[in-house]
Amino acid sequence: MAEEIITSTNAETATDHEYNASEIQVLKGLEAVRKRPGMYIGSTGERGLHHLVYEIVDNAIDEALAGYCDHIEVKVLKGDIIQVTDNGRGIPVDIQADTGLPAVTVVYTILHAGGKFGGENSGYKVAGGLHGVGASVVNACSEWLTVNVRRDGREYEQTFRRGDPDGPLKCIGTVDPSVTGTRVTFKPDPEMFKDTTVYNFETLEKRLREESFLNAGVKITLTDERELYTPVLEDGKEGEPTYRTEVMCYEGGIKSFVTYLGEKRDLEVLHPNVIYLKGQTDRGMAEIALQYNSSYNELLLSFANNVNTPDGGTHEEGFRSSLTRVFNDYGRSHGLLKDKDENLSGADVREGLICVISVKLQEAEFEGQTKAKLGNTEIRTLVSNMVYSKLMEFFEENPGVAKAIFEKATQAARARAAAKKARELVRRKSALETSRMPGKLADCREKDPTRTEIFIVEGDSAGGSAKMGRDSAIQAILPLWGKMLNVEKARADRIYGNDKLMPVVLALGCGIGDEFDISKLRYDKVFIMADADVDGSHICTLMLTFFFRYMRPLIEQGHVYVAQPPLFKVQKGSTIKYAYNDAEMALLSQEMPGAKINRYKGLGEMNPEQLWETTMNPDNRVIVRITIEDAEKADEAFTILMGDQVEPRRRFIETNAQYAKLDV
């Protein structure tokens, strides 16, 4: 739709509404959170819903960092009510001087209130919840919240409703003076979380397991009390019905984390023991665990004060730059790199790396309340110096391990050089052609990339139908045929020589890997359109693996979609309807008794008009947008599904069968 610009010829329209001080709103208390919750928890969808739990758990973890807590219990109660209990000191209940309110009331009703602002004089030397908004934001986003505090031999309780106190703090009894801690129970507000208020056990488990790895020796228990389940015992018999529970405690800390990540992917390691580096200054502490494997991919997870930093920051920058320097300096000094050899690149030395970085700082500087990126400049120097000295020392003491890792990096460098030559060859060849576009591409007429879309179609037959049925003004078609390359088992140099993937690279126009530039993307929407069967699903997975490994911003910025062709055509007389799954088919069978039913075995069975109407027409089509909520989880899935190992792939499919679309 063209942009509509409205102008007014009525002078009174522009002056009737006077803009003055009465137009300025001052939001009091927690009104700002309830009015713009996304600013504080990221979204009001599933991600933001789970973020509420993380905020409360982070407060308990801060008690663990301070040395006062070693057990955190998280329960999902019936009705998707959350309860988090820790055995820390308990939130203070005495009167806070500035407000005249009990400290616990202040913490849950006033933004930027907490015990983490005083540096050396605060209740916490290191904390992830540095903004002092976590508890109050959860309160504001809850239909109701109750906090119980045990300290000084007494138990206190206060309840809030949508952020406001539902009565004063009360002492409800006495307890053993040695029993201390805080329990927070809350129900997310359905008025705010309109999409869902249902918690996903696996999502919570993953985050809490991370917390357990990052805090060696701290036990975290997660229990789902929404319904009982019957476990299957080792002998194959059914056990007694119980609540699903995961108990997580790792004495090995982030070393155990790296081992866990590798074992989940069933990767072949280059050295049996995880390399562990640790350094400290008066400004903070850093610890790094790393291990190399035979894969071609890198997995780096970073944390600051136990908060995951998916967008990286200064701690990652310090690690990456120093790691590359260590390899090149060690290689030169030990004759592994000759004078004529180029230096290894960062990508070379990180191929096959699994690494966890954890830093602890007194004054962590995050970008935004969701804390996706660390900004402390001093931590870059700490990490860089520590990695250089400690890793160089490790290599000197373990020359066999150093040599194995170095050989891996030099192989990556040779592949990178081969990829560069292949890339230049492709460019020279393209420059000689009248058009850089692949021959089978049927491009669209529109040149504005924000208005266009491309369908990558399985098979020449379906590609032909798509070309005839499309809206040629805005829709481009690129047919694919033959066996696709599995990039999980190949380096970049093979992509440039691949006649299935290079047409995709050329058509999209934005390059791959280190040269990827999303500003050059030629289409706003990139559709994968394959048959609705096992082969089609496999091709779709191969394409998604390629995009994830070499064009990840395409997915991260929401450009990749999977088209959903119908499975059935249902016709009764002149009435024709389509069913996209078995459930829709069952409903149509009841609605149209005696109808003729055709199951489509492939896209090629549909004529151009049907393909347009069911799968390509923006007004009618069913599509799935591909997103990455969790890069580490996505990495694990692609590694398992597209890797060499059969057994972990079988386990993964069995575990996730309820979420999969199977054709058997």
Question: How would you label these PLM feature ranges?
Answer:
Residues Q96-A97, V104:
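Short adenine-binding "F-helix/F-box" segment of the Bergerat
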Residues K35-Y54, K125:
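Conserved short strand/loop->alpha-helix "switch" segment adjacent to the catalytic nucleotide/phosphoryl-transfer site
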Residues R414-E433, D448-E453, G464, M468-R470, ...:
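C-terminal interaction appendages of subunits in large macromolecular complexes
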Residues A2-S22, L30, Y54, D62-A64, ...:
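GHKL-family ATPase ATP-binding module
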Residues G90-I95:
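A short glycine-centered beta->alpha linker in the GHKL/HATPase_c
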